[in-house]
Amino acid sequence: MGGASACIPLCLLLATARMARPQTPERPVFTCGGILTGESGFIGSEGFPGMYPPNSKCTWKITVPEGKVVVLNFRFIDLENDNLCRYDFVDVYNGHANGQRIGRFCGTFRPGSLVASGNKMTVQMISDANTAGSGFMATYSAAAPDGKGDRYCGGRLEKPSGTFKTPNWPDRDYPVGVTCVWHIIAPKNQLIELKFEKFDVERDNYCRYDYVAVFNGGEVNDAKRIGKYCGDSPPVPIVSERNELLIQFLSDLSLTADGFIGHYKFRPKKFPTTTTTPVTTTLPVTTGLKPTVALCQQKCRRMGTLESNYCSSNFVLAGTVITTVTRGGSLHATVSIISIYREGNLAIQQAGKNMSVKLTVVCRQCPLLRRGLNYIIMGQVGEDGRGKIMPNSFVKMFKNKNQKPMNALKNKQC
């Protein structure tokens, strides 16, 4: 009896200690899509941090309190990499129904903060049947429309004229990890004229790191891209095809620069207009061609010169052939890029700082590509983003002395 009495205080002490022990917070369980509300929360691909499933389409609808805007921050992203994000990707939209697309993301690049124009945002992830990764994880939060801080930018512009600029302009450099989207909307019978007054964005030959992209219409759509810009030379004035333009600015997590300030104004449609030539040219896509006896019996010789073939080609590059595989009379090659002079719709694969493309030589020995050799290659682009090399395509050995005339051609207006 005495022993039992002595146990009572000890048992109470142990029970109290167990109750006082801090509880380990539960890890969120991520499912395919859902309705998310409140001031803040988490969003992630199905099964994160495990591999996301193939052949899936997941949609999350986020709503924060009225009078606030949604701010989305990606903490981690690992999806199948593709230059055009055609296979596995995450789309982010303003609103819930038929909203403007703010951005499309894939690979492992983590974009900056994404800000909706209102209190609703839609996130959609699509995966195909092939390569997968760990997916993504992001946080969303509510912010005051006019108190989002220096890291936030973008918005809907509907006044007859106005200005847009990078965060911190002109006091200091723009910050790292920023994504800004300005959606300019004019009345139906008007167009939009765009001019950059000052421009200084981290320089790169292919504008891979920090860049400004301008699109006809109200969403990020490579088929409607007017140009992609970086460096310290302001783009030439731009005139929209219709009454909407979208401007996207993105900075990565390394170097920054002064940034830019630009102005826009509406103008009547009746004025004669010419849309500026894109920096990254989008040309008509050619259909896939199969080798035929007649086609492959053509004389195998290149036609014309560097100059005469440059503008008629969808893409122009110098590169090293790293792999070749023969399939059904055609040669499929992977080419590591030395320099690219004209990109068109060519799908460029990137691994670190190395870039490569897939090419199909329709008639496998005409023209002849050998592994380990460097070539200047001009050709067309198929619907799959591969380069198409025909018997009369311009292909020649690339030597260092070719660099100067090729750079001169790169500045040529076609």
UniProtKB/Swiss-Prot annotation:
O-glycosylated; contains sialic acid. Residues 1-22 form the signal peptide. It comes from the Eukaryota. GO terms for biological process: cellular response to leukemia inhibitory factor. Residues 296-414 form the NTR domain. Residues 32-143, 153-267 form the CUB domain. It is found in: Secreted. Keywords: Disulfide bond, Glycoprotein, Heparin-binding, Repeat, Secreted, Signal. Binds to the C-terminal propeptide of types I and II procollagens and may enhance the cleavage of that propeptide by BMP1. This is Procollagen C-endopeptidase enhancer 2. The keyword Signal applies. Glycans are attached at N354. Disulfide bonds join C32-C58, C85-C106, C153-C180, C207-C230, C296-C363, C300-C366, C311-C414. The lineage of its organism: Eukaryota, Metazoa, Chordata, Craniata, Vertebrata. One of its GO terms (molecular function) is heparin binding. InterPro entries: CUB_dom (IPR000859), Netrin_domain (IPR001134), Netrin_module_non-TIMP (IPR018933), NTR_PCOLCE (IPR035814), Sperma_CUB_dom_sf (IPR035914), TIMP-like_OB-fold (IPR008993). One of its GO terms (cellular component) is collagen-containing extracellular matrix. PANTHER family: OVOCHYMASE-RELATED, PROCOLLAGEN C-ENDOPEPTIDASE ENHANCER 2. Interacts with heparin with high affinity, and type I or II collagen. Pfam families: CUB, NTR. It comes from Mus musculus.
